[in-house]
């Protein structure tokens, strides 16, 4: 029997199919599937984030990855699939779906960034790290609609025309703004929006999780910039427990009988055969005691179905009729995740011990890949990261809301399975991991704190909106967003400096936030519990390398 816990609600070149593998696996003898008890999740602090959990026999847990998408792969699909993905399909709307500060506080938000960039350039120049003939590159990853680039370049151009000292002119002569985005639709929009900048702006299509594949090693002197980009990295959904176990979520979609009856009459024959075939394979492997009716979707059949549905006018109603289940298996099923948990077992254990409860958390492995790539391409300069997130304590402490959110036209929710392919899905950034991964590749933390500290050391007066924007539609809400900018605890600023930059510049030493776990502040019982959890967690995930 399938046990449901509750009733609550890619990169383009990726090959999702696994037909041959499914058939090969089916050749092995099948074990009986007795009715399974529903996992006891009462000790999970934020158990409401677990959606329609079902179980498989322990002997089959390691096979789940061969049939179903991990939660991370599901997120990758619905955001970036070339036909069904929210970003790649061009459905994204930066005004209706959500607001970002480069839009709501434009152009003053970008002007603060521009002044910080000027100070970094000036510090490198005075220290001799940047020569007068060197190019100074502003490389933005996840440029979205290109508003950040447009406003920054506009400010730099205006400043060099007004400045009598000649410094801004020197920067303008050296600067090149290069934007990278994985969405072809966003690349096209940026190119049009920034066409007035001429040769000062370039936009290129590329995946930010692998910067070293886009840019030659050691070729950049300047600033690596991102605003609300890391939060879009796809994440593994993980349950961390006080007993030291770690479980990762896989997504098992099903077509209820009524929905399959509708789709069967309309779907292409090849898709019908794929769904029927993989449903039989999945039932035989995991759920052969289940009554027939609903159709189980494998990784391959779900992707094929979603891409076909995306072409239909009634896509929203159809995709919302799919029932999504989650299957949790030991995290060692994904070796890269197991390696991450092993390397960061200590801080995870400390925060679990402080909480005294199991917890659902979201882990991005791409944060580390991004920082590794940035460390390789940046010869000298800075990394300026603006995003919402927290340190170890904040990222594991369950808030009244989920650390994962979904944004679409006129709404925000925490259900990633609603309106699949029609919404953005974002997750709070673990800045402690970003900083640690940066240090490992020569990027030292110069500042970490609240986003409002971006204004530090700049002459920008946020209370003085430019006269030409007083009649703009967003200007009427400007003060509301300004107060949010000043008071928000969620948005953070991380400034990192590449080693050997030796710039005559330091970020203002203001209200810094700690990045590491304060182990000295732990009470002895909590410290002992943390040591025990760390030992068990390290042992559990170490099995992945055997």
Regions found by a protein language model. Name each.
Residues 223-340, 400-407:
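A mobile, often basic/glycine-rich helix-loop segment
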Residues 313-546:
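Long, Lys/Arg- and hydrophobic-enriched amphipathic alpha-helices
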Residues 150, 234-236, 395-396:
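Short glycine-/acidic-enriched loop or helix-start segments at secondary-structure transitions
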Residues 211-232, 362-376:
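Conserved adenosine/adenylate-binding substructure
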Residues 36-141, 145-221, 238, 467-469, ...:
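Rossmann-like AdoMet
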Residues 1-43:
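N-terminal mitochondrial targeting presequence
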Residues 143, 229, 386-389:
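Short, well-ordered beta-to-alpha junction loops that form the rim of enzyme active sites
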């Amino acid at each position: 029997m399938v046990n449901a816990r509750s009733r609550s609600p890619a990169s383009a070149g990726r090959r999702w199919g696994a037909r041959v593998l499914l058939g090969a696996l089916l050749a092995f003898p099948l074990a009986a599937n007795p009715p399974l008890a529903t996992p006891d999740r009462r000790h999970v602090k934020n158990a409401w984030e677990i959606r329609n959990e079902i179980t498989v026999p322990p002997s089959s847990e390691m096979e789940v990855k061969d049939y179903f998408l991990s939660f991370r792969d599901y997120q990758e699909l619905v955001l970036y699939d070339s036909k069904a993905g929210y970003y790649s399909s061009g459905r994204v709307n930066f005004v209706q779906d959500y607001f970002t500060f480069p839009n709501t506080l434009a152009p003053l938000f970008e002007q603060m960034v521009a002044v910080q960039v000027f100070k970094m350039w000036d510090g490198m120049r005075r220290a001799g790290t940047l020569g007068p003939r060197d190019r100074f590159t502003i490389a933005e990853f996840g440029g979205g609609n290109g508003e950040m680039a447009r406003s920054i370049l506009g400010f730099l151009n205006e400043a060099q025309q007004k400045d009598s000292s000649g410094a801004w002119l020197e920067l303008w002569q050296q600067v090149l703004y290069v934007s990278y985005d994985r969405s072809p639709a966003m690349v096209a929009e940026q190119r049009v929006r920034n066409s007035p900048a001429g040769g000062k702006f370039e936009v290129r299509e590329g995946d930010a999780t692998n910067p070293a594949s886009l840019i030659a090693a050691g070729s950049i002197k300047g600033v690596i910039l991102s605003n609300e980009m890391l939060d879009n990295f796809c994440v593994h959904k993980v349950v961390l427990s006080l007993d030291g176990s770690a479980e990762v979520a896989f997504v098992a979609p099903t077509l209820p009988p009524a929905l399959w009856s509708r789709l069967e009459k309309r779907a292409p024959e090849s898709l019908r055969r794929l769904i029927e075939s993989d449903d039989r394979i999945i039932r035989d492997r995991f759920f052969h005691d289940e009554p027939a009716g609903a159709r189980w979707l494998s990784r391959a059949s779900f992707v094929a179905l979603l891409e076909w549905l995306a072409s239909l006018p009634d896509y929203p109603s159809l995709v919302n009729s799919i029932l999504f289940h989650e299957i949790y298996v030991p995290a060692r099923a994904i070796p890269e995740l197991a390696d991450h948990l092993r390397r960061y077992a200590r801080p995870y254990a400390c925060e679990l011990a402080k909480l005294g409860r199991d917890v659902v958390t979201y882990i991005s492995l791409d944060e580390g890949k991004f920082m590794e790539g940035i460390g390789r391409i940046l010869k000298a300069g800075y990394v300026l990261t603006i995003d919402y997130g927290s340190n170890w304590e904040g990222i594991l402490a369950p808030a009244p809301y989920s650390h994962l959110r979904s944004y679409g036209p006129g709404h925000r929710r925490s259900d990633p399975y609603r309106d699949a392919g029609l919404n953005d899905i974002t997750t709070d950034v673990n800045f402690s991991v970003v900083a640690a991964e940066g240090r490992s590749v020569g990027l030292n933390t110069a500042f970490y704190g609240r986003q409002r500290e971006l204004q530090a050391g700049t002459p920008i007066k946020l209370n003085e909106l430019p006269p030409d924007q007083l009649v703009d539609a967003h200007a009427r809400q400007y003060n509301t967003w300004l107060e949010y900018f000043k008071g928000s605890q969620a948005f953070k600023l991380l400034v990192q400096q590449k080693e050997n930059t030796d710039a005559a510049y330091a970020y203002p030493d203001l209200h810094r936030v700690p990045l590491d776990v304060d182990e000295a502040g732990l009470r002895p019982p909590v410290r002992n519990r943390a040591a025990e959890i760390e030992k068990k967690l390290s042992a559990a995930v170490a099995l992945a390398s055997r």
